[in-house]
Amino acid sequence: MTITGKTKVAGIIGWPVSHSLSPPMHNAAFEALGLDFTYVPFPVAPERLAAGIAGLAALGVVGFSVTIPHKVAILPLLDRVTPEAELIGAVNTVAVEEGALTGYNTDGIGLLSALRSKLGFHPEGRSVLVLGAGGAARSAVASLGLAGAGRVEVANRSPDAGRCLAEAMRERLAGTDFGFQPLGQISDKGYMSSFDLVVNTTSVGMAGDAFAGLDLAALKPGACVYDMVYAPPVTPLLAQAEAAGVPWANGLGMLAAQGEAAFRIWTGAIPPEGCMEKALAARLTTPGNP
């Protein structure tokens, strides 16, 4: 594409940010729709965050994605935060309109979209086991609760973090039963048999490591497994699900779907179906990429 003085700019801030897969994903969608937009990475050091986002607003960018380590730190620097982002306690997308910055969190939208499209899973009234209690887990737990899940159980190595997450959501979302279980105590078949879905929100699996004692064969009939990890495309958790005959999906669909939601916020347009995910898959299979 040709960049001119009329080209609208979006981007992503992080530290570091050179590894991000978001630029090829968004630029593929801009090109497919013939939109005069471009998406670029902006490396912003933590101590320069306030100056960085003020500069982006002053330069007239339409919006930007937010990645590590800024998702929480950016909250007090925004003019407005959506209720879902406030509940999650993190922002991954910012829209800039007439100099005002609005923070969104599209991670939950991405997860729910991927669960529907990849696994045909709808959370309403269902029981879900979420592995992990970090930022990704908070997004998953909140979005599942907002979508009407009947029960969401958090399993984490650190009891304090897991218990705090469950208690925080219990206080805010009365319609869902939120609970906590130490990660080392979820191997009981009777416990596992109560779940319709297992979601891994941790980095376990990226380096070939696995969860010990997790019996996926004991899940409810018709249950499924979702792993937010997308590289490698089949983690040990997903290989275990395959061996147990449990439907599964990796995190590529979620990554694309949260990007599609951000794209709609900035442009008002809907990316062609599958465009962003195809761009991600192509980049991931390029030598030297994640």
UniProtKB/Swiss-Prot annotation:
Chemical reaction(s) catalysed: shikimate + NADP(+) = 3-dehydroshikimate + NADPH + H(+)
InterPro entries linked: Aminoacid_DH-like_N_sf, NAD(P)-bd_dom_sf, SDH_C, Shikimate_DH, Shikimate_DH-bd_N, Shikimate_DH_fam
UniProt binding sites for shikimate: S20, L21, S22, T67, N92, D107, Y230
CDD domains documented for this protein: NAD_bind_Shikimate_DH
Pathway: Metabolic intermediate biosynthesis; chorismate biosynthesis; chorismate from D-erythrose 4-phosphate and phosphoenolpyruvate: step 4/7
Catalytic residue positions: K71
Recorded coiled-coil stretches: none
Keyword DNA-binding: no
One GO molecular-function entry: shikimate 3-dehydrogenase (NADP+) activity
One Pfam family linked to the record: Shikimate_dh_N
Zinc-finger recorded as keyword: no
Recorded GO CC terms: cytosol
Name of the top EC class for this enzyme: oxidoreductase
Keywords assigned: Amino-acid biosynthesis, Aromatic amino acid biosynthesis, NADP, Oxidoreductase
EC number: 1.1.1.25
PANTHER family per record: BIFUNCTIONAL 3-DEHYDROQUINATE DEHYDRATASE_SHIKIMATE DEHYDROGENASE, CHLOROPLASTIC, SHIKIMATE DEHYDROGENASE
Stated family: Belongs to the shikimate dehydrogenase family.
Function noted in UniProt: Involved in the biosynthesis of the chorismate, which leads to the biosynthesis of aromatic amino acids. Catalyzes the reversible NADPH linked reduction of 3-dehydroshikimate (DHSA) to yield shikimate (SA).
Summary of subunit composition and partner proteins: Homodimer.
Protein name: Shikimate dehydrogenase (NADP(+))
Originating species: Citrifermentans bemidjiense (strain ATCC BAA-1014 / DSM 16622 / JCM 12645 / Bem) (Geobacter bemidjiensis)
UniProt lineage: Bacteria, Pseudomonadati, Thermodesulfobacteriota, Desulfuromonadia, Geobacterales
Primary gene name: aroE
